[in-house]
């Protein structure tokens, strides 16, 4: 299904107190809402510090194809906050205080028969993996076949850590109001790099993210090590979420899940190519050869270059497909003799997936040539 839009889901994540106060409601004047700004700053810190874990929480084999394309956010974690909040953040960083909040503009429809609409100051950005949408965040990386539980465990834990660190510091402050103000400015300045309101699909963003030092974990295999870092052990251990042993086990299971999924797909591809595609192309080459022979016999002077060129092209692609299938078979056999699940997963990504692509290339070309029959 290459080129067909992948399927995912939006994990709407909101935060409210036990008395019903929405901690993510900026109000009419966000620049004056100190509680909201502190919560936002803590979330920025959490996502920036643990971007690798958040990326890993949405790692499934299918997302390797989906993220960064097919109407899905990129694999680079960033936060979209909209023009209004970005302006407030920049005011606080540059001057130490925010004096105003932008209001929404007008959305030009470009259609003379339709009116222009008021544009929300937060707007929406479908290319962002973690977007603020008025009074909540949307985490948009979770794959359709995956549970949202892993993503929410990570989100809740990393934000809890940021809240705890903020609370520990503020509870010791002699001047609470001044301490809150200073903390907001400090956190916003330290983690400003995680804010990105632009086009997440662009190559320019990939380059900019690298300059900012943001991780770009393009595939599931690259993201799994985030589970077994000292940072992860401390985070989940301090809050009683996972022990070190549980995280190591989860990483092993993730490697196994990836490897088995790719192996099944590779075997399916070998089967399809061997039992359906190659026989169909062989039948078509026979038809072409018979046509060419019949034309030559019936009218030697007739131009048979079309049949000749087509027969040569199809035969060459058939040979390419046969060679690629044999190569993939050999790699699948080699995979069986690798004992470590981590090494199996890397072997799948580094060797088997490129071999699968090498097999599908001639098959895709033949699909545009060989008739439906």
Positions of predicted regions on the chain:
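Active-site capping/gating regions of soluble enzymes
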Residues: 1-253
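C-terminal amphipathic alpha-helical interaction region
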Residues: 189-373
């Amino acid at each position: 299904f290459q080129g067909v839009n992948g399927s995912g889901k939006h994990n709407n994540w909101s935060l409210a107190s036990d008395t019903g106060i929405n901690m993510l409601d900026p109000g009419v004047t966000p620049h004056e809402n100190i509680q909201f700004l502190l919560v936002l700053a803590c979330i920025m810190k959490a996502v920036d510090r643990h971007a690798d874990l958040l990326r890993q929480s949405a790692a499934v084999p299918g997302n390797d194809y989906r993220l960064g394309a097919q109407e899905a956010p990129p694999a680079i974690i960033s936060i979209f906050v909209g023009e209004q909040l970005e302006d407030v953040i920049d005011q606080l960083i540059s001057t130490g205080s925010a004096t105003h909040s932008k209001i929404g503009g007008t959305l030009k429809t470009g259609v003379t028969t339709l009116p222009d609409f008021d544009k929300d100051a937060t707007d929406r950005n479908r290319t962002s993996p973690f977007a603020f949408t008025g009074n909540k965040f949307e985490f948009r990386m979770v794959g359709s076949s995956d549970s949202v539980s892993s993503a929410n465990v990570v989100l809740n834990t990393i934000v809890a850590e940021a809240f705890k660190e903020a609370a520990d510091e503020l509870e010791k402050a002699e001047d609470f109001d001044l301490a809150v103000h200073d903390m907001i400015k400090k956190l916003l300045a330290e983690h400003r790099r995680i804010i990105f309101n632009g086009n997440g699909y662009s190559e320019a963003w990939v380059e900019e993210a690298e300059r900012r030092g943001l991780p770009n974990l393009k595939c599931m295999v690259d993201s799994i090590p985030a589970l077994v870092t000292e940072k992860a052990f401390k985070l989940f251990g301090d809050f009683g979420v996972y022990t070190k042993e549980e995280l190591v086990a989860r990483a092993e299971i993730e490697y196994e899940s990836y490897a088995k999924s790719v192996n099944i797909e590779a075997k399916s591809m070998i089967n399809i190519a061997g039992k359906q595609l190659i026989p169909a192309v062989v039948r078509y080459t026979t038809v072409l050869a018979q046509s060419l022979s019949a034309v030559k016999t019936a009218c030697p002077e007739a131009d048979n270059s079309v049949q000749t060129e087509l027969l040569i092209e199809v035969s060459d692609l058939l040979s390419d497909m046969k060679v690629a299938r044999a190569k993939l078979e050999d790699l699948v056999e080699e995979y069986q003799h690798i004992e470590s699940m981590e090494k199996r997963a890397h072997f799948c990504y580094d060797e088997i997936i490129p071999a699968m692509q090498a097999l599908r290339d001639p098959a895709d070309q033949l699909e545009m040539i060989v008739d439906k029959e």
